[in-house]
Amino acid sequence: MILNILLTLTLLMGRVKSDPDPLQDYCVSPPPSSHQQIFLNGKLCKDPTQASVSDFSTSALSRPGNTKTKPFMINVTVTTTANLPGLNTVGLTMARLDFGGSGVVPPHVHPRASEVTVCLDGVLLVGFVDTSGRVFTQELHPGETFVFPKGLIHFLYNIDTVSSALAVSGLSSQNPGTQIVSLSSFISKPPFLVEVLKSAYDINGQDVARIRKSLEG
């Protein structure tokens, strides 16, 4: 009986994916409309006969992002079905990461996707920590690539305090999700109980208030 249950679970887990396999060539996301027809599984798709080449291309990642007004001196530009309609159901996301001097993508997770990053300009310190607490870090120079396993805490940091840096990432889900550890812990809505944060991080109530104020800007 136990063997049968384990075999069943193994088979089921092998079928679990962040994004389901598409059942057609493409499912271009249409502009919002109250008269939209449904072509697949309850999901909105443009009539395939109306799809055009512009649905499958975008210049969204060609424009540099402004890092000076952004928290952590980092600007992330992401492809979505709004700027790349043909992205719908293909199970991918692309992101442009512009770093200011000492810019950082703080420790965060993508619960539904693995990520591969290519450094295009500057030098980045990148890394992740596995579930045993082991840390893997590497300096990335232009043209070098690093992969972050799905669901693990990871970061990217521009080691130059003055010059900018640039990277492009690909993620294995149309909706990878992002949780920045510090923000999720200290400025969630509604907030965590102060007692929970005090115990979890071995800090006092004043520390909690100070950290929250700092993260909220």
Curated annotation (Swiss-Prot):
Gene3D superfamilies recorded: Jelly Rolls (2.60.120.10)
Keyword Flavoprotein in record: no
Entry keyword set: Apoplast, Disulfide bond, Glycoprotein, Manganese, Metal-binding, Secreted, Signal
Subcellular location: Secreted, Extracellular space, Apoplast
The keyword Signal is annotated on this UniProt entry: yes
Coiled coil: none
PROSITE patterns: GERMIN (PS00725)
Covalent S-S links between cysteines: 27-45
Record's signal peptide: 1-18
Sites carrying sugar chains: 75
InterPro entries: Cupin_1 (IPR006045), Germin (IPR001929), Germin_Mn-BS (IPR019780), RmlC-like_jellyroll (IPR014710), RmlC_Cupin_sf (IPR011051)
Known role: May play a role in plant defense. Probably has no oxalate oxidase activity even if the active site is conserved.
PANTHER family: GERMIN-LIKE PROTEIN SUBFAMILY 3 MEMBER 3
Protein name: Germin-like protein subfamily 1 member 1
Protein species of origin: Arabidopsis thaliana
